[in-house]
């Protein structure tokens, strides 16, 4: 995640399930450059030389998801509301944690968030994360992940809260004391 708080931009990149495996010996560029370019106002090229990804870009009130599957770049502008994305498509029911938790996040958002204090908004969403962690970090429905059981050396490392307006980004993060294991977060300004 990269934040440009002065320009109201935020970008998050997620690894995407590879639909086309690159040829052996192919040298791929880092996906990290894409988030840096995004917060500077640059678009993803039509044929990135990276592994597959989903890039979430926030610029003021506009939110876009750009996906690269190794064959084509797709861009979707999000409608207002609650959405989830992981290693497949936006709001994709193929992802167990999206099927399980998207309705609960949406339910927690039914009260007009603008009428809630910042701490109340945070508590609702952190509560959903905590409930998901009760399943265990290797469970397909869990949001806080330890994917080593599935053959991937990836673990959840932190929890972030971001609020974006037309002119600024407010960002807080909390590192998980033990990667892949939930604990009550203590947030610090980013």
Residue locations for each model-derived region?
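N-terminal nucleophile
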Residues: 1-190
């Amino acid at each position: 995640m990269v934040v440009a708080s002065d320009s109201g931009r935020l970008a998050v990149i997620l690894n995407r399930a590879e639909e086309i495996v690159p040829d052996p010996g192919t040298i791929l560029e880092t996906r990290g450059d894409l988030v840096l370019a995004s917060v500077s106002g640059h678009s993803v090229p039509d044929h990135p030389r990276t592994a597959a990804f989903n890039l979430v870009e926030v610029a003021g009130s506009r939110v876009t998801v750009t996906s690269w599957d190794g064959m084509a770049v797709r861009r979707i502008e999000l409608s207002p509301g609650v959405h989830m994305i992981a290693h497949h498509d936006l709001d994709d029911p193929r992802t167990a944690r999206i099927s399980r938790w998207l309705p609960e996040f949406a339910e927690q958002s039914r009260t007009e968030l603008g009428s809630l204090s910042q701490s109340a908004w945070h508590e609702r969403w952190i509560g959903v994360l905590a409930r998901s962690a009760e399943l265990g970090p290797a469970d397909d429905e869990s949001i806080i992940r330890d994917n080593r059981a599935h053959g991937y050396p990836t673990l959840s490392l932190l929890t972030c809260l971001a609020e974006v307006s037309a002119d600024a980004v407010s960002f807080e993060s909390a590192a998980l004391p033990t990667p892949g294991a939930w604990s009550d977060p203590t947030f610090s300004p980013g």
